[in-house]
Every structure is written in C-alpha cells, then in structure tokens.
Curated annotation (Swiss-Prot):
InterPro entries: Apo-CII, ApoC-II_dom_sf
Designated name of the protein: Apolipoprotein C-II
Keyword Iron-sulfur attributed: no
Pfam families associated with the record: Apo-CII
Gene Ontology biological process terms, A to Z: cholesterol efflux; chylomicron remnant clearance; high-density lipoprotein particle clearance; lipid catabolic process; lipoprotein catabolic process; lipoprotein transport; negative regulation of cholesterol transport; negative regulation of lipid metabolic process
Family membership noted in the UniProt record: Belongs to the apolipoprotein C2 family.
Upper classification of the organism: Eukaryota, Metazoa, Chordata, Craniata, Vertebrata
Protein's organism: Rattus norvegicus (Rat)
The keyword Manganese is assigned to this record: no
Chief location of this protein within or outside the cell: secreted
Length: 97
C-alpha cells in the first residue's frame, strides 16, 4: 500500500508540475491557487522524505549492512564465475572442438 500511495502522490505532483498547453486564461487567481497547492504538496513531500531519512538513520544496523555487503560480494563473485563458465562453453560450442 505504501508504494501505491507514493506512486499516486508522484503522479499527482507530476500532473501539477506540468503546464497544460491550451488557451490562456485571464484569471490570475487560479494560477496563484495552483502555486499554493503545489507549494504545500512539495513541503509535505520534503517533510515526508526527511522523516523517512531520519527513521532509516535511527534503525540502521551495522550487522545487517555488513551481511548485505558480504552477500553482494559473494553473489557478484558467483555471477562472474558462472559468466566465465558460460562464455567458455559458448566458445567451445561455436568453435566445434
């Protein structure tokens, strides 16, 4: 649900941020209202990002980070090995030896 909310919020901000190409209106009050709404949405978005960043910093665990880094290095080493084996097999198949 959280990702859907952020996607909907992102799309709403994208729509509000883009200007619609059409006939020009003489009413300057509507653009001021749109600017105010957009400004409030951006301030809400920035405060939500800051709160998420603070929460991440509070819950940051070095042991989990070390495990993730170790898992990444092991999996990338395994992928390098398997890619080398695949390349050797492919070259052997193409050469016909």
């Amino acid at each position: 649900m959280g990702s859907r909310f952020f996607l909907a919020l992102f799309l709403a901000l994208l729509v509000l941020g883009n200007e619609v190409q059409g006939t020009e209106e003489d009413d300057p009050g509507s653009s001021a209202l749109l600017d105010t709404v957009q400004e409030h949405l951006f301030s809400y978005w920035n405060s939500a990002k800051a709160a998420a960043g603070e929460l991440y910093q509070k819950t940051y665990l070095t042991s989990v980070d070390e495990k993730l880094r170790d898992m990444y290095s092991k999996s990338s080493a395994a992928m390098t090995t398997y890619a080398g084996i695949f390349t050797d097999q492919l070259l052997t198949l193409l050469k016909g030896e």
